[in-house]
Amino acid sequence: MLSRKGIIPEEYVLTRLAEDPAEPRYRTRERRARFVSKKGNCNVAHKNIREQGRFLQDVFTTLVDLKWPHTLLIFTMSFLCSWLLFAMVWWLIAFAHGDLAPGEGTNVPCVTSIHSFSSAFLFSIEVQVTIGFGGRMVTEECPLAILILIVQNIVGLMINAIMLGCIFMKTAQAHRRAETLIFSKHAVITLRHGRLCFMLRVGDLRKSMIISATIHMQVVRKTTSPEGEVVPLHQVDIPMENGVGGNGIFLVAPLIIYHVIDSNSPLYDLAPSDLHHHQDLEIIVILEGVVETTGITTQARTSYLADEILWGQRFVPIVAEEDGRYSVDYSKFGNTIKVPTPLCTARQLDEDRSLLDALTLASSRGPLRKRSVAVAKAKPKFSISPDSLS
């Protein structure tokens, strides 16, 4: 029997599975458009860009950013066009030298065995991909042919370097590593050390670590300045805590990242009722680090809308000790349980700490009352009758 530590108390009941597939996908009320999707994609469409030529100043990045069908099309067409272009050059050299005229075999040709455009095209492929010459080869008769041979080899090497490098960068892009960095589907707000905290869980499915991992969080909401200026996407950085202080994390096992809602937090006036009808609140979480195996910087992103924040719940433990090592149960990665939490804003809690004292007293009496009621209702396993004593 495996020894386990950190078993969930029996009085707690699992209330929500964060990855519950049965949750309805469509809602009756209209939701605010996300700035960042749950998978980390930025929901921004760029329109009316006048200076399109700026993209051509960085051709390599433009090719890497293209979709795979477009990249493969450019990859194929670049080689085909270069072969056809130099095939035309070889055909013109043979035509100018008179190598295409039938019945004249006394002159030494510039390139042997070129009698048509098809043979010139085959010779162009043989030169550029260096698969070796067959019956066609360059002679010493035409210095121009030797120069074209050198130019085509250099151009072929440049095309290989650019296109193969582009394909390699697309297959080794950093966002591929981010597919195994996961966030909890829901965030929670509950008490920790007597303060309301915004919490989420983050984990890494791979054994290879993320070096120098840091996590940041921003609140994006629509605001209006005192001068009447409407800012549709006002971004505010808020500090995150991971139990040891600072933004750096050691992501060897899933961690609960939390933000203390204090007077400097944009969530200071957030109430439980605001989570059901708040349309302008979006919390963006960014995890960034260096991939241990490749050394490439990767970034994983997600966001939480107001209705994706659970008030008065916390994440269940998923790390247990088994046979001298720690085991992580990812099936409970998004599970939460209800815990006593004041139904007020952090500002109201700071102004009236008696709410916290009353909550602490009620929670301490709760388990005792449950046990006393259970003992009172329990039936004895056996009874002793007076006749048996006589």
Swiss-Prot record:
Principal localisation: membrane
InterPro entries tied to this protein: Ig_E-set, IRK_C, K_chnl_inward-rec_Kir, K_chnl_inward-rec_Kir6.2, K_chnl_inward-rec_Kir_cyto, Kir_TM
Transmembrane segments: 66-92, 143-171
PTM notes: Phosphorylation by MAPK1 results in changes in channel gating that destabilize the closed states and reduce the ATP sensitivity.
Pfam families cross-referenced by the UniProt entry: IRK, IRK_C
UniProt topological domain (Extracellular) ranges: 93-116, 134-142
Statement: the UniProt record of this protein carries the keyword Transmembrane: yes
Gene3D superfamilies assigned: 1.10.287.70, G protein-activated inward rectifier potassium channel 1
Topology with respect to the bilayer: Multi-pass membrane protein
Residues bound to ATP: N48, R50, Y330
Reaction(s) the record says it catalyses: K(+)(in) = K(+)(out)
Intramembrane-annotated stretches: 117-133
Topological domain ranges for the Cytoplasmic compartment: 1-65, 172-390
Modes of activity regulation: KATP channels are regulated by cytoplasmic ATP/ADP ratios; ATP inhibits the channel by closing the pore, while ADP activates the channel. Activated by phosphatidylinositol 4,5-biphosphate (PtdIns(4,5)P2).
Molecular-function GO term, any one: transmembrane transporter binding
Domain writeup: There are two PtdIns(4,5)P2 binding sites: A canonical site where the phosphate groups of one PtdIns(4,5)P2 molecule are coordinated at least by residues Lys-67, Trp-68 and Arg-176; a non-canonical site where the second PtdIns(4,5)P2 molecule is coordinated by both KCNJ11 and ABCC8/SUR1 residues.
Entry function: Inward rectifier potassium channel that forms the pore of ATP-sensitive potassium channels (KATP), regulating potassium permeability as a function of cytoplasmic ATP and ADP concentrations in many different cells. Inward rectifier potassium channels are characterized by a greater tendency to allow potassium to flow into the cell rather than out of it. Their voltage dependence is regulated by the concentration of extracellular potassium; as external potassium is raised, the voltage range of the channel opening shifts to more positive voltages.
Family: Belongs to the inward rectifier-type potassium channel (TC 1.A.2.1) family. KCNJ11 subfamily.
Protein name: ATP-sensitive inward rectifier potassium channel 11
Organism: Mus musculus
GN (gene name): Kcnj11
